[in-house]
Swiss-Prot record:
This is Large ribosomal subunit protein uL6. Belongs to the universal ribosomal protein uL6 family. Pfam families: Ribosomal_L6. The gene is rplF. It comes from Rhodopseudomonas palustris (strain BisB5). NCBIfam families: L6_bact. This protein binds to the 23S rRNA, and is important in its secondary structure. It is located near the subunit interface in the base of the L7/L12 stalk, and near the tRNA binding site of the peptidyltransferase center. The keyword 4Fe-4S does not apply. Part of the 50S ribosomal subunit.
Amino acid sequence: MSRVGKKPVTVPSGVTATVEGQTVKMKGPKGQLQFVVHDDVDVKFEDGSVKVAPRFETNRAQALYGTARAQIANLVDGVTKGFEKKLEITGVGYRASLQGKKLQLALGYSHDVIYDIPEGITITVPKPTEINVVGIDSQKVGQVAAEIRDYRPPEPYKGKGVRYSDEFIFRKEGKKK
């Protein structure tokens, strides 16, 4: 049994939760999100909290219901607080700038990389070497941050590239003569 899945997800005041079949909808001050739970997982909304339980005693159902509970908890966090990922750009001449709904990245290529910002995501550039990705959907925020990082992942010799602000880059020594 999943320890995570056993705990009910408490819905704070100011957030309305509805369960329609296998769809869980959350509406809060930051917006509205929904999540479709797998058929092997049973979802109930009672006493101001969402409870998740496996429908069958299979290994698959046991694995999925802890995941479903975590996803529903992310919905509550998203509509109340939101999610944020911070990226740092390291390297000579590497910088970022916003141009309307597009993020322009100068990452050492012969051309600038233009990234279209998807709906529901807000990107701010407080400094030319910092990017903040903010949104209510944790998966979307993480996906956008990962896509931006993939344009120039940090390399281990000089540490140049785009990295998460809390990421540690294992540095290597160069060749010795």
